[in-house]
Amino acid sequence: MSASRLERRIREAQAAGRPALIPFLTAGFPTPERFWDELEALDAAGADIIEVGVPFSDPVADGPVVAAASQRALESGVTLRWIMDGLAARKARLRAGLVLMGYLNPFMQYGFERFVTDAADAGVAGCIIPDLPLDEDADLRALLAARGMDLIALVGPNTGEGRMREYAAVASGYVYVVSVMGTTGVRDGLPVEVADTLARARQCFSIPVALGFGISRPAQLEGLSHPPDAVIFGSALLRHLDAGGDAASFMKAWAER
């Protein structure tokens, strides 16, 4: 099977001797208007892939920063339809691979078949749906694959080898390795078990391995003898934007590491 768009983005970064950079930005944050400016700024500043968060009223896996951003976006009227329309209008000038990350309910309300059609038309390359179990994702995975899109798998410290191999049998794009159990959020360091989780993921998956949850600065990766193929950062970026910073300056610190 040939590499997907998302896998190719990460492999291109590896060929350049660096991990791929994957910022996460909640759709409609800090404001609906500024969101699109910051999305394009991330793209221009060198993001290889951008995860666009779909706001939801009950974000059980999100820490306070992402949850607050989601609530603000909902109060501003942001919907999955709004996201689709905005991405479609900009797809010709966005270089980064686009991933929609959100909880199952908004996608179900939209309708899987209509969602996949509209996502493909908007230039989306993949989806992450944390609360869609592997045992129930076959229909959506097939619909996405038929349009050249990936359904990204998430694994963590408590994912056993058997379960990892089940994910690996159907996974495409990249595998999202959660650094720590619990919710998203900025942390000072990485748990000691991260190296083991990354090593187990590398043994099971042939696609690139991306590390997320609690990643805020390049220095956190220095203690890893085998760093991930891609790095995902969200809460630190959202906090930076909320404090008046801009996406380009945040990306610069990562691009120059």
UniProtKB/Swiss-Prot annotation:
Output the superkingdom of the source species.
Bacteria
Q: What is its EC number?
A: 4.2.1.20
Quaternary structure (record): Tetramer of two alpha and two beta chains.
Q: Which PROSITE patterns match?
A: TRP_SYNTHASE_ALPHA
CDD domains reported in the protein's UniProt record = Tryptophan_synthase_alpha
Q: Name the residues annotated as catalytic in the UniProt entry.
A: 51 (proton acceptor), 62 (proton acceptor)
**Which protein are we looking at?**
Tryptophan synthase alpha chain
Q: Name one GO cellular component term.
A: cytosol
Give a yes or no for keyword rRNA processing in this entry: no
